[in-house]
Amino acid sequence: MNLPPLTPPDFGTVQNFFFPVFWGVEDREAITNLARAVTEQVEPAFHFADNFLTWGRNNSMFQDLPFVKAWQDNVDCDSDFAIVWRRYVLACAAYHAVHLDGDFVECGCYRGVGIKTVVDYLGGVEFPRTFWGYDLFEYVPGMEHHPMRDHGPGLADEIKAKFAAYPQVNIVQGEIPAVFASRSPDSISYLHIDLNQATAEVAALDALFDRVVPAGIIILDDYEWAMAYRRQKLTEDPWFEKRGYRVMPLPTGQGLVIKR
């Protein structure tokens, strides 16, 4: 496998990251100014974006140069730039999972940015696994989750075209879980679920969790987010508890599970 080498860090250099894109506030300017004032009083490196502020961190993602290139090459909006820590969680999980047998799966691939960042980080067109991306790509009124900016006719074809040079990436349009009946892998080493609603996420877990191989990784994008996403945690916690698992909450808002 042609995997990215570890970039030796400079002991004396750490990189700050301040990108004021966040959600759930009324006065964005006030929050930005408060965060900037905090960063002027703390030790480096600080990181402010995506609803969290921390300092005294290595900000390792910015020292991993192959990741930085994959991330920057695939950013297509401010939100993608802001969630760099979330993207690096995916990249590191994928680096682990690519050493296992099993395909990669993302439920809720939307514009394909998460998939393509991971694939480009781990070899690009030489990515050594099959990657399945599922999405309805359209918003139907009455759905449990909110519409996304680019939902609508033509989005599925646009995302399929994005991966035209990647024969190992399968973009599948359809409603979860019914879509799995026609096209889905038998064995999974990496499962990323980002459906923005509890009902569909539990349906995806019902269908796919038993296919995840031992040591495979499940990442729940919205697990530790409250606000509009709190129902996902409240629904998924008992689901995992029945199976003897506890989701690891991450400060990025994600949740992580390692399959036994």
What positions do the PLM features span?
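Rossmann-like AdoMet
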Residues: 1-87, 93, 98-100
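S-adenosylmethionine/decaboxylated-SAM
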Residues: 52, 56, 60-81, 99-260
